[in-house]
Regions:
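Bacterial signal peptide processing site
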Residues: 22-24
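Positively charged n-region of N-terminal signal peptides that target proteins for export
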Residues: 1-5
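Sec-dependent N-terminal signal peptides
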Residues: 6-13
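Non-transmembrane, aqueous-exposed alpha-helical and coiled segments at domain scale
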Residues: 45-98, 109-270
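C-terminal motif of bacterial Sec signal peptides marking the signal peptidase cleavage site
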Residues: 15-20
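Post-signal peptide N-terminal segment of mature Sec-exported envelope proteins
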Residues: 28-50
Length: 270
């Protein structure tokens, strides 16, 4: 009996030893939380580029508000540079003259009124198809200034203009001597000076006079003296501001009153 007890005890101890030496069960890790994947891919919208606003450097708004004169330039067509008529803007004429004034506004309007007669019913005028006779010598009074602006629009140039080169086989491409000044000063008073425009393909002819003496504000000796002070930089800020207003009001007057009777006289010649 005692022997059986010892055998039982030995077996019990051996079982306990084996149990103690057995490796502990590995911990079961919990499954990681599922990551939600959006069914629709996020749409990234690219910012729409914003066009910068055109900034005008002109401080006198009327300069850019004058309607353009549409013209056909035959040279543009044969060189493949445009597909149709091109606008000619008053602001470009101002750049050419170096300033805007009653005279530049008058030259622009003289040309506009002449072309409306020569090319009626919405017909687009053609550069190089117009001959202009100036009312005086190019260095007399402001005749040359008027002529420069008229040339810019019509293409009619004095002897300094393009002679056409190989393209001169078609008179449209000749610009030289289509603006003719008198050889000697005429001495005419400005309101009596008549610019004669001739359409070369039809022979239609129109004259335009510009009665600039009715422009207001009126020029005075005091205004002339102030102009000298402005040019010398001697005018006070208040004087300069007043002179600027006076000067540009005269140009505005031309555009705003161009259809007043007696301001621009248009004569159609048969």
């Amino acid at each position: 009996m005692k022997k059986l007890y010892f055998v039982f005890a030995a077996l019990t101890i051996a079982a306990m030893t084996l149990s103690a030496c057995a490796p502990a069960p590995e911990p079961v890790s919990e499954p990681a939380p599922a990551i939600e994947v959006p069914t629709d891919a996020a749409i990234v919208e690219e910012p729409v580029p914003v066009e910068p606003e055109a900034v005008s450097l002109w401080t006198q708004e009327y300069i850019t508000q004058v309607p353009p004169i549409m013209m056909i330039e035959p040279y543009f067509a044969i060189f493949g540079q445009t597909a149709g008529p091109v606008p000619y803007y008053y602001e470009e004429a101002v750049k050419l003259a170096g300033h805007s004034c009653g005279a530049t506004a008058g030259a622009w309007t003289i040309t506009k009124k002449a072309l409306e007669v020569l090319y009626p019913n919405g017909e687009i005028p053609v550069r190089g198809q117009i001959h202009v006779d100036a009312p005086g010598a190019e260095d007399e009074w402001f005749v040359g200034v008027f002529g420069d602006i008229i040339m810019y629009i019509t293409g009619a140039a004095p002897k300094t203009g393009f002679n056409g080169s190989e393209f001169a086989v078609n008179d449209l491409y000749v610009r030289q001597n289509k603006m003719v000044y008198s050889e000697e000063p005429t001495g005419q008073l400005p309101p009596m000076r008549e610019w004669i425009f001739t359409r070369l393909d039809t022979g239609a002819k129109v004259g335009v006079k510009f009665n600039l003496v009715i422009i207001t504000p009126l020029p005075t000796p005091a205004r002339a003296e102030m102009g000298k002070k402005v040019a010398l930089g001697q005018a006070t800020p208040e004087e300069a501001a007043d002179y600027i207003q006076y000067w540009n009001d005269r140009a505005r007057f031309v555009f705003e009153n161009q259809d007043v009777d007696g301001f621009f006289t248009v004569t159609i010649y048969e």
